[in-house]
Amino acid sequence: MHQAGASTRRLHGVAILSTLKSMSTTPRGRIAVISMHTSPIEQPGVGDAGGMNVYIRSTSLELGALGYEVDIFTRATRSSQGKIVQLAPNVRLINIIAGPYEGLSKEELPTQMVAFTSGIIEFAQCEKVSYSLIHSHYWMSGQVGWLLRDLWRVPQVHTAHTLALVKNSALATGDRPEPESRRICEQQIVDNADRLVVNTEAGKDNLVFHYDADPEHIDVVLPGADVTQFSPGSDRATERSRRELGVPLHATVIAFVGRMQRLKGPQVLLRAVANMMKKHPDQELRVLMCGGPSGNGLARPTEFEDLARDLGIDPIVRFLAPRPPEDLASVYRAADIVAIPSYNESFGLVAVEAQASGTPVVAARAGGLPITIDDGTSGILVDGHDPADWATALQSLCDDDDRRIAMGENATDHASRFSWASSARHLSDIYEDAIRKGPHVRCGSDRAGAS
């Protein structure tokens, strides 16, 4: 396996160290966090990076602050990344070489699970470190974590973030369903992991209903938001954001933030806006679409630009590249409304970030969004994805300045209940309980069943 050089570099504001000796012991234990298919330092909104990346990085940093030693394992995608990235005291990102740096689609990554697992084992042996617990994220990492759990004889905590059967039950028109092979892998993880962590009670219900999970093995941990990064701006800051984005100061602005794929519903918003402009052609409306193509959207990267043009609304729609949090905050502040027409969201981090920025949210009543939004107080929940219904909900806020402003003020208060520090404390309790009990032992041929 290639080893990184001895120099120190900079990447996304963190130091990259090619060699870093590990502490042999720590009062709180050492955690192996596994995120095979996407790195937590990748830009959200690019490729497969999204809320899960923010979740892993944010909780890991908070766990490090609590005294845990956290090693996050991800698949290397660039030779310049270095072997070890020091994100913070106690928190390291380990780039494991498994297959070529480029050229593999997300659907092809399962072919590298053995190589990735081998790389983790080699790293632990070479560094002479042992782990108290494994926390895997997403189904591919769950499969890797399952093997390491049995090898290291430590408990495995797993967070799915999304589930094949849940996604397939709410597909957008034209979206490709998740394969049965993924469903089987998810079932195996559910059957073998020591603890399952979900973002909401709805996520818990989905595991029980679709995967026959034992509810006693499921913990609900609400994600958080960086309220220091995302906070309401002054009128002057809002004006500056609009000027930088090329948006008229007196226009009503609707923003979409997320990956450009049908599952996230950008087509719903664009059709709703076309409906709004048809009924109210004289209103000064602008739409900001912030994000890059991902998943099935990679097959047609200009699909939504083409749709805006076909609908005749391209003069009022601006597509923005994904941007880091410090720049994304200005998009939220520039907007009067943030729209989230997703077909499924395990939580809805964008909703919390937008509300923390003082912007009301109009979102689909799907997944965890009813938890992140206080319907009628900090935003509006829309049943279904009919563009006409979305046009009605959006227009109601565009036309009522007092209601929209009041919702924005309420949104800030509502978002304050979501904290990464609180999430990490809850995870710590789960970890300590799992470590105390140790990995459960299952004997018999059903451990790898495909039921």
Swiss-Prot record:
Q: How does it assemble?
A: Homodimer.
Report a single Gene Ontology molecular function: acetylglucosaminyltransferase activity
What Pfam families does the record tag this protein with?
Glyco_trans_4_4 (PF13579), Glycos_transf_1 (PF00534)
Its GO biological process terms?
liposaccharide metabolic process; mycothiol biosynthetic process
Give the binding site residues for Mg(2+): Y332, R333, A335, T359
Annotated binding of 1D-myo-inositol 3-phosphate, by residue: H37, D48, A49, G50, G51, M52, N53, K106, Y138, T162, R182
Indicate yes or no for the key word Glycosyltransferase: yes
**Using the chain's own numbering, where are the disulfide bonds?**
none
The record, for HAMAP family, names: MshA (MF_01695)
Q: Which CDD domains match?
A: GT4_sucrose_synthase
Q: Which InterPro entries match?
A: Glyco_trans_1, Glyco_trans_4-like_N, Glycosyltransferase_grp1, Mycothiol_biosynthesis_MshA
EC number(s): the record gives 2.4.1.250
- State the superkingdom: Bacteria
Q: What is the lineage of its organism?
A: Bacteria, Bacillati, Actinomycetota, Actinomycetes, Mycobacteriales
> Is Glycosyltransferase set as a keyword in this record?
yes
Protein residues bound to UDP-N-acetyl-alpha-D-glucosamine: Q43, P44, G51, R259, K264, R323, E345, E353
Q: Which reaction does it catalyse?
A: 1D-myo-inositol 3-phosphate + UDP-N-acetyl-alpha-D-glucosamine = 1D-myo-inositol 2-acetamido-2-deoxy-alpha-D-glucopyranoside 3-phosphate + UDP + H(+)
Query: To which species is this protein native?
Result: Corynebacterium kroppenstedtii (strain DSM 44385 / JCM 11950 / CIP 105744 / CCUG 35717)
**How is this protein named in the record?**
D-inositol 3-phosphate glycosyltransferase
